[in-house]
Amino acid sequence: MEHCTKKPGGDKEIPAYTADAIETRMRERIRETIQALVEEELEAVLGAEKSARVGEARQGYRHGARERTLTTSLGPTTIAMPRARLRGAAGATTEWRSETVRRYQRRTTRVDEAILGVYLAGTNTRRIKGALAPLLRGGPLSKDAVSRLVGRLRIQ
């Protein structure tokens, strides 16, 4: 019996030992690694592991998770970003913000560098998405996002 796996985004099965299967597993490992880093960061801030009862040592509480699509160098990856409320000194609560995956971050630094490299090579903002289609693999990229990225480059 031949080993098969389902291709992400479709019901078509592909052989488990092909280049597509390798990329699929790598994307899965990237997703797991990003989620583990975010969980570690949140546990450090809260002072407790998920579902742990530690009493006064806890600095806040979890309250669900939301999906976020992050475009990595292997294509788009959907991660579950945990949410938490942090207790302040005066008893006020604030929403936790991850330092690992920033609030409006949609691409990794390597993807941003690739976008800037294509732009600096002379490609106009509308054609960059087509030029980087193999890298982005359907990940979102608008001409406005490219313009904002170039604007940040000009400021630096």
Region roles according to the model:
Residues 30, 120, 137-138:
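Amphipathic alpha-helical interaction elements
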Residues 44-59, 155-156:
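Active-site phosphate-binding and catalytic loops of NTP-dependent enzymes
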Residues 38, 115, 128, 146:
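Residue-level signature of catalytic and energy-coupling elements of molecular machines
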Residues 148-156:
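Short, basic alpha-helical nucleic acid-contact segments in DNA-binding proteins
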Residues 126-138:
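DNA-recognition alpha helix
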Residues 12-19, 60-119, 141-143, 151:
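Basic, short loop/linker segments at the boundary and entry of helix-turn-helix/winged-helix-like folds
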Residues 1-40, 44, 107:
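Residue-centric detector for conserved, function-critical "anchor" positions
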